[in-house]
Every structure is written in structure tokens, then in C-alpha cells.
């Protein structure tokens, strides 16, 4: 774990870079296991309706659960606090193509991030569209081709497969713009651009990203970015000045910060094995529970398809830090998880 002070020290670190790949790829050892259970058969689906790749999950203040998933098409489902299906939001929406994330803000507005349409859509608690950031690639004839190459060319004036959205206490919007542009962008609450961090190209230095895959904002307005390809979490203040790097979390696919006076950071460590025929099968599967300063409280879970195991966690709702909703890509499911924390010493 590395820390940076604001101002000249941060600039010096940026210029010098971080030496030593072992430092960047450090993994937490001797982390205590947190006892937990998965609630069996929690979600009650309508006949012939199933989850696909479960990309995002979020709860509102009433405890209703939103699941954003994709099979042949992208769909957003709402469930009541007991897991009973309520309704589908925006079926066959122009903004739905390849789901990536759903979040609920402090006013119970529902936001979806679709990496296929490059759109972030804000909806009222009743389901009315209030704001759209980004634009779906359009063509007069046929389909717009996805940018090719490794890495693909950046799309700095547009979103390039965005991945997540979050807000600070003032309502400013932060978007991780993810697979192509490798940056985080800050907008005001009305959607006006303020600033961005990231070089628009993959990089491993501080202030650079290799697929910023998820983000979360704490009560002080600090932004925690899951820099998945670099196996770290970069922490920025509200002006997107680097404050710390946590490199003890493995391969972070998802981050979530719980509300309340004592906030916790949850981070999923998913490591698909590219050498297997099913390259998306997770071989780690654990979720870390952390203090906001990067100390690890404990971890739970392991890779697998059984109840209480995880296959590539892509979404975590931690509105209640002892009762999580966890969505998985490879297992095509969503689990309700109850933690039974024990008193432990945090690990750095």
C-alpha cells in the first residue's frame, strides 16, 4: 500500500513513477476469514425468466433490489426486499445493449451504465428518464463497427465502453470510462464536464489506468477506482488528485463503499484463468472487506459454482455492510450474503 500527499509530493511521485513490479502486485497474506452464509433461493423469478450474466446490482432506500444483466439482450429487473420480482425497467430501451453496471444514488434515482451504447442513463424512482450522458454509436446503414486493435484507439471526446458511475455528497458525477479511454471523468450534477484523470491510453504509472473497471465515492468525496488491469485501487480526492494506491487486493473487478458513520470498502478479487477453455471461470473468487485507509479487515468466499462460492463477481451492493447482494458473470446468478464478522486485527 502506497500513500501520496497532495501537491508537490504527489507531482514528484507522478514523475518518478512506482518502481518494482512486485510492489505493484503485492497480495495480502494471512488475512482472516469472515464467516458468512448465502441465502438459498432468495430471488423469486416469474415463469421462464432467468438471470443472464449478472453485471450489476444495487438497492434503494426501501431495500428494493435492482439487477442489470445480459443474455440475448440487456434487461433491468427490480425485486422487493424479500427477493420477489416487481417489474422490468425500460424493456427494449434504446440505451440497452451490453449491460455493465447499475447504481442507486442518495435520492433513489437509478443509474445504468451500458458499455455497448456508451450511455449512462439516470432514471427517477418511478422509472422516468432524467438524464443521459453519452451517445449510442449510430450509422445510416448497417451497424457501427467497434474500434479494433490492441489497445483500440482512444475516443477522448466520447465515452469508450464506460464501466461505472458514482456521486459525491454535492451530487457531482464520476464515471469510469473504462475499456477504451482508461480514464475517470468528473461532471457536475447537471452533467457539465469538470475534469478527468487518466491518459486516454493504458498505463501503469500513478494517475494512469489499465481498465478502470469500477469506482466508489466515500462520504468525504474521495474516489476509489478499481484499476483492474494494474491489480490495484487508486484513491483520489474530490479534485482527482492522487492520495493513495492499495496494491494488496489482487485483481479488483468491483468496489463498493458502505454508508453510515463507519464506512467499509469491499473489493472483489476475481482472476479468470485465460489458459482454460472457459476463460471467464474464476480461480480466486474472494471478496475483501477493508477500512477506507486500505487495511484489510478480512475476506470471504472462494471460486466455485456452489451456494456461497463465487464465479467472477461483477457487482456488490453494500448498503448494509453485514448483508450484501453479489452478482456474478460466469455463474449467471445473484446471491444474498450475510456476514458474521468476528473481532480481528486489520492487515496492511
Language-model regions: role of each:
Residues 16-19, 289:
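Hydrophobic membrane-targeting alpha-helices
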Residues 1-9:
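Bacterial N-terminal signal peptides that target proteins for export
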Residues 8-17:
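Bacterial N-terminal signal peptides
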Residues 23-348:
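Eukaryotic scaffold repeat domains enriched in small/polar residues
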Amino acid at each position: 500500500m502506497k500513500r501520496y500527499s497532495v501537491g508537490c509530493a504527489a507531482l514528484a511521485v507522478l514523475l518518478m513513477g512506482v518502481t518494482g513490479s512486485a510492489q505493484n502486485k503485492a497480495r495480502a497474506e494471512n488475512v482472516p476469514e469472515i464467516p458468512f452464509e448465502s441465502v438459498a433461493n432468495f430471488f423469486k423469478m416469474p415463469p421462464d425468466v432467468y438471470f443472464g450474466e449478472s453485471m450489476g446490482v444495487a438497492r434503494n432506500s426501501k431495500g428494493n433490489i435492482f439487477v442489470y444483466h445480459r443474455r440475448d439482450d440487456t434487461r433491468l429487473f427490480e425485486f422487493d426486499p424479500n427477493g420477489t420480482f416487481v417489474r422490468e425497467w425500460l424493456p427494449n430501451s434504446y440505451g440497452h445493449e451490453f449491460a455493465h453496471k447499475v447504481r442507486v444514488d442518495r435520492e433513489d434515482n437509478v443509474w445504468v451504465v451500458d458499455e455497448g451504447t456508451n450511455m449512462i442513463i439516470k432514471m427517477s424512482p418511478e422509472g422516468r428518464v432524467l438524464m443521459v450522458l453519452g451517445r449510442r454509436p449510430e450509422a445510416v446503414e448497417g451497424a457501427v463497427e467497434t474500434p479494433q486493435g490492441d489497445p483500440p484507439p482512444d475516443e477522448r471526446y466520447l465515452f469508450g465502453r464506460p464501466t461505472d458511475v458514482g456521486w459525491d455528497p454535492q451530487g457531482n458525477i464520476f464515471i469510469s470510462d473504462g475499456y477504451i479511454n482508461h480514464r475517470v471523468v468528473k461532471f457536475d450534477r447537471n452533467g457539465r464536464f469538470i475534469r478527468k484523470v487518466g491518459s486516454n491510453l493504458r498505463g501503469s504509472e500513478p494517475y494512469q489506468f489499465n481498465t478502470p473497471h469500477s469506482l466508489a465515492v466515500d462520504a468525504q468525496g474521495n474516489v476509489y477506482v478499481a484499476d483492474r488491469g494494474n491489480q490495484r485501487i487508486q484513491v483520489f480526492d474530490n479534485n482527482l488528485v492522487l492520495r493513495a494506491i492499495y496494491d494488496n487486493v489482487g485483481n479488483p473487478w468491483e468496489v463498493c463503499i458502505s454508508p453510515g458513520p463507519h464506512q467499509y470498502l469491499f473489493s472483489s478479487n476475481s482472476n479468470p484463468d485465460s489458459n482454460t477453455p472457459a476463460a471467464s471461470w474464476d480461480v480466486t473468487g474472494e471478496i475483501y472487506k477493508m477500512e477506507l485507509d486500505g487495511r484489510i479487515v478480512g475476506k470471504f468466499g472462494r471460486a466455485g459454482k456452489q451456494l456461497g462460492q463465487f464465479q467472477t463477481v461483477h457487482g456488490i451492493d453494500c448498503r448494509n455492510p453485514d448483508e450484501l447482494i453479489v452478482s456474478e458473470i460466469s455463474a449467471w446468478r445473484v446471491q444474498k450474503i450475510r456476514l458474521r464478522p468476528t473481532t480481528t486485527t486489520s492487515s496492511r
